[in-house]
A protein has these predicted regions:
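Conserved SAM-binding loop of SAM-dependent methyltransferases across substrates and taxa
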Residues: 1-14
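A generic alpha-to-beta junction signature in SAM-dependent methyltransferases
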Residues: 11, 38, 98-100
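Residue-level signal for beta-strand positions within conserved beta-sheet cores that form or flank
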Residues: 13, 52-54, 102, 136
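Residues at the starts of beta-strands that form the adenosine-phosphate
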Residues: 15-16, 105
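S-adenosyl-L-methionine
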Residues: 16-76, 86
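C-terminal catalytic and target-recognition region of SAM-dependent MTase-like enzymes
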Residues: 64-65, 72-77, 84-163
């Protein structure tokens, strides 16, 4: 999505990228976007997740199962979670992807009723490992209305290295 485009647009900011989706149409769009942002060749058709370049792994995959691949677990400094209807539910299965040898970051989007935001904040904090000392606890920020009763929110969490 747009967050990845912004990150890839910054010189020398992004190293390896892992991107997956279960939806073939979303993967096709991802590959089109990577082609534009990276100015590299990418497949035109979605396929199961694989290494497409030395520093790019992308394709069709269930993100909740990636933690079981020893080549992917524990390697990533940042997670961008853009499944707003399921972010809180799947966070525990994504955390094992983080490289906990140093600080890392999780950014996500959540759809929640405004009255439920404080409970969603608690659920996010519970799902994540200890946060980096001195950084604020993750807290949902309303980005825009999703419907008459629901809000599209975002959060950011700095994760402490494992002891």
């Amino acid at each position: 999505g747009p967050a990845l485009a912004t990150l890839l647009g910054e010189p020398d900011l992004v190293g390896d990228v892992l991107a997956s989706d279960l939806n073939p149409d979303a993967v096709e769009m991802l590959l089109d976007n990577l082609r534009r942002w990276d100015r590299k060749e990418y497949p035109s058709e979605p396929a199961p997740i694989s290494r497409l370049h030395e520093d790019r792994i992308a394709g069709l995959a269930d993100a909740t199962k990636l933690q079981h691949d020893p080549n992917l677990a524990g390697r990533w400094d940042m997670l961008l979670v853009n499944l707003p209807h399921r972010t809180i539910e799947i966070l525990p299965s994504l955390v094992p992807l983080l490289d906990r040898t140093g600080p890392s970051m999780v950014r996500g989007r959540v759809i929640a009723a405004e009255a439920d935001i404080h409970e969603a904040d608690r659920a996010i904090r519970h799902a994540l490992p200890p946060r980096l000392e001195g950084m604020p606890e993750p807290s949902l920020r309303i980005k825009r209305d999703y419907s008459s009763t629901l809000r599209l929110c975002s959060f950011e969490a700095w994760i402490a290295p494992a002891p």
